[in-house]
Amino acid sequence: MKKSSKEISSSQSLKNGGSDHFFNTSLMYVLAACLASFIFGYQVSVLNTIKNFIVIEFGWCTGNKVECDDSTLKSSFLLASVFIGAVVGSGFSGYLVQHGRRFSLLVIYNFFILVSILTSITHHFHTILFSRLLSGFGIGLITVSVPMYISEMTHKDKKGAYGVLHQLFITFGIFVAVLLGMAMGEAPDAKSVDALGEFQKIWWRLMFFFPCLISILGIVLLTFFYKEETPYYLFENGKIEESKKILKKIYGTDNVDEPLKAIKDAVEQNEAAKKNSISLMRAMQIPSYRNVILLGCILSGLQQFTGINVLVSNSNELYKEFLSNKLITTLSVIMTVVNFLMTFPAIYIVEKLGRKTLLLCGCAGVICAFLPTAIANQIDSTSAFVKNLSIAATFVMIISFAVSYGPVLWIYLHEMFPSEIKDSAASLASLVNWVCAIIVVFPSDIIIKKSPTILFFIFSGMSILSFLFIFFFIKETKGGEIGTSPYITMEERQKHMGKSAV
């Protein structure tokens, strides 16, 4: 019996590890990029378990109150410096990705080799602060480069699932950073004057060096195995046959006319936008474009006010208010394991439930976690029940974030903007995200020492605001074509881009 063309196409797709399966050629490219996501998570969390060891080795706090207050301020700067650097990096990322998505990843990996070496040999506050600022700069580049690479290197039906891998590897990096920190032993008090052991003096430096090894692996993969640029970038630069070739790998079939046409349409729209000078500044003067940019920036900024980066970068300090030193790092490790594992469900439900529904569920989870906890702490923060409730609340929050706001935001930011402003608008939204991270993380050390209840009230209140904002203003993007936006009609875009955008 003669097979139909559909059957032949299907069998060929299976033979090539096509798009019907989660594990296929496209996934290999995505994983090579997600090593940068791992570095992102690792760098954000690495100070969580070793910060106090650094304070002791550098002798920032030896018992004098003024000296120790100054030490707390230094610790706050070290925590926030990554996010300050990320603001600059995310602002620069839009320029970098214009030279190639794969190229930007190679720049990032080479950059982190240098940064890892610099951080591991530091001996002074100013040098470690500078190296942490550089780490943040690299992270800022990652926030735009990796999601864009994944979005353009992925089958249309897998964009959501593969997009979640960016967040999954971030959580894995967070987990590994805290796990390696366990080798340092019991979390010390920053005011301790006891000298560190030889192993501890070496180990915290090796922890800073570790991303260098991951970066080398990333360079090897992108240089020798996954050498192609994204099909969108290739087509945009006139390399149509090369674009078609990589699309065949991604889709697992020789028939790639439909995705090629989608890229062609998106590139033509983008070309028309460039001819008509739809810059970010001009877009902000056009109501329809300004609205979608503001929505993306607000959504991105609100993510930080769930409190995620306080838990990721400073959970040890928070848990000190509720636990003995012996259990602090262990609990932080358990928290990062939960964070990592609970990102997996998002891979499967992001395409089933959609982006908006997941965002709403995540905000509701944070509200349910922190609001009762804040009220309970206000009534009696000394009771064992309230302390246990506070610890449980952090886990409920982590679970809620891991399956929703964490992975979905970065997918959404690359689906909500039309192609003519996508690069610059996504970069601006990422920049806003990092500015808000600084606002939240920098005072966290001081606020935790004063009263964790304040943080619980802030995070629950902002999550209520986030829920209302998403419910009333955010639209679904699931299943949308590349380069389109549910917020701006093609007619509206043509009005500003010209008829050539059709």
Curated annotation (Swiss-Prot):
Full protein name: Hexose transporter 1
Coiled coil stretches, renumbered: none
Entry's family note: Belongs to the major facilitator superfamily. Sugar transporter (TC 2.A.1.1) family.
Regulation: Inhibited by compound 3361 (3-O-((undec-10-en)-1-yl)-D-glucose).
Localization terms from the record: Cell membrane
Main location per the UniProt record: membrane
Signal sequence residues: none
Organism of derivation: Plasmodium vivax (strain Brazil I)
